[in-house]
């Protein structure tokens, strides 16, 4: 029994060390590639505080690292949406929280909106292209049923338009035409008007 515990502890420690290395590498990749989409594996290793060999031990190629980063980003965005109260908060509040989750995600993963970045894969799970529209559509439908949103327009169309508005606002920030604060405020106001909201988010009252 003692022998099995003695061997299990180093194994757990190695797994824990490996997990920390992977997390450090992914976080470094998020930051470095977010600043410069063509950053090298050497630069990522330096930022992560590990050797290039350690990076390659976990990710055999830069493409593999990017794919893992995209998977992590998709999971993080899904968690942000889960925490946003989209199905429970008052509709106007939920809509504001949906947009806020998007802004936080964009700030953490600017790579995803970088027009110079090429070869960005789609995630295999929690793909925002698949996950986000139906969740937003469900929120808008709830607001329409409650009378908080205008019910004369199709919820799927409104969801697509809201997503497009936020992408457009993010592009304005990336091009230096708006500050992040200005873009967030304009996007929220435009979204509420688009949905015909008869209520205002609690935070903006």
Predicted segment positions?
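Hydrophobic/aromatic residues within well-ordered alpha-helical segments
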Residues: 69, 73, 77, 98-102, ...
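Hydrophobic/aromatic-rich alpha-helical bundle segments in the mid-to-C-terminal region
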Residues: 113-118, 126, 130-133, 145-190, ...
């Amino acid at each position: 029994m003692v022998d099995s515990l003695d061997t299990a502890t180093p194994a757990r420690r190695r797994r824990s060390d490996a997990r920390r290395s992977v997390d450090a590498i992914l976080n470094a990749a998020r930051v470095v590639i977010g600043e410069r989409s063509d950053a090298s594996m050497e630069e990522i290793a330096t930022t992560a505080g590990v050797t290039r060999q350690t990076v390659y031990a976990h990710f055999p190629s830069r493409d593999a690292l990017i794919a893992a980063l995209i998977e992590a980003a998709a999971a993080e965005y899904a968690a942000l949406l889960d925490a946003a109260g989209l199905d429970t908060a008052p509709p106007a509040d939920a809509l504001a929280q949906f947009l806020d989750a998007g802004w936080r995600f964009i700030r953490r993963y600017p790579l995803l909106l970088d027009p110079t970045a090429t070869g960005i894969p789609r995630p295999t799970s929690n793909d925002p292209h698949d996950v986000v529209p139906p969740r937003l559509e469900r929120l808008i439908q709830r607001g329409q049923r409650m009378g908080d949103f205008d019910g004369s327009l199709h919820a799927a169309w409104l969801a697509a338009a809201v997503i497009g508005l936020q992408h457009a606002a993010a592009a304005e920030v990336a091009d230096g035409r708006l500050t992040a604060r200005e873009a967030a405020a304009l996007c929220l106001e435009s979204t509420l008007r688009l949905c015909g909201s008869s209520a205002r988010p609690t935070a903006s009252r």
